[in-house]
């Protein structure tokens, strides 16, 4: 009574704000734990232990064996977190995002016109970051309608769908990219 039994060093992980796997088989036993690790990072502001990140990167392909409804449940919770953008970047760096959303890959390196200083992928991530910033200060940005917006975004599903929409907002650009022969300007008609 009153004594904490900590077989895996969880207290130290909490103090260090780290998410760490408890065994090498943890992701093979349940691939959805890959997403859960990222979700915990997003929700708690934690970071992945380097060995854990390496292992989930190696086993990310196992996500294709997981039930889609379990994957979507974790993704909704992850994207509903106030600051998921850094975690989405990390998911991209580990290859997890490409497994979940292969349609995002063509955005990388897709150059834009002079109105954009970033390629489409970097722009999409930047847009997600700005959306998160806006959501944190709705009354300042929308002084007359922030309460209605906040009510719409009360459920984690609505908040997640908004952020996913922002991340995917330029998905059509790679397929519609063209070059105006007269001006030499990059175009995206119909995106």
Which residues does each predicted region cover?
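Histidine-centered divalent metal-coordination motifs
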Residues: 169
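Glycine- and charge-enriched loop/helix tracts that form the active or gating conduit
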Residues: 1-159, 163, 173-190
């Amino acid at each position: 009574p009153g004594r904490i039994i900590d077989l895996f060093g969880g207290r130290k992980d909490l103090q260090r704000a780290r998410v760490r796997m408890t065994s090498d088989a943890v992701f093979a036993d349940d691939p959805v734990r890959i997403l859960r690790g990222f979700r915990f990072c997003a929700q708690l502001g934690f970071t992945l232990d380097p060995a854990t990140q390496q292992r989930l990167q190696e086993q990310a392909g196992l996500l294709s064996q997981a039930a889609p409804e379990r994957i979507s449940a974790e993704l909704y919770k992850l994207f509903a977190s106030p600051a998921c953008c850094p975690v989405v970047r990390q998911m991209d760096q580990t290859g997890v995002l490409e497994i979940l959303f292969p349609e995002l890959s063509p955005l990388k390196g897709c150059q834009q016109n002079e109105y954009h200083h970033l390629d489409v992928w970097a722009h999409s991530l930047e847009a997600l970051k700005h959306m998160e910033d806006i959501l944190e200060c709705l009354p300042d940005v929308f002084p007359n309608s922030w309460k209605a917006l906040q009510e719409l975004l009360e459920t984690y599903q609505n908040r997640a769908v908004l952020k996913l929409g922002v991340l995917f907002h330029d998905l059509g650009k790679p397929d519609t990219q063209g070059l105006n022969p007269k001006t030499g300007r990059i175009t995206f008609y119909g995106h």
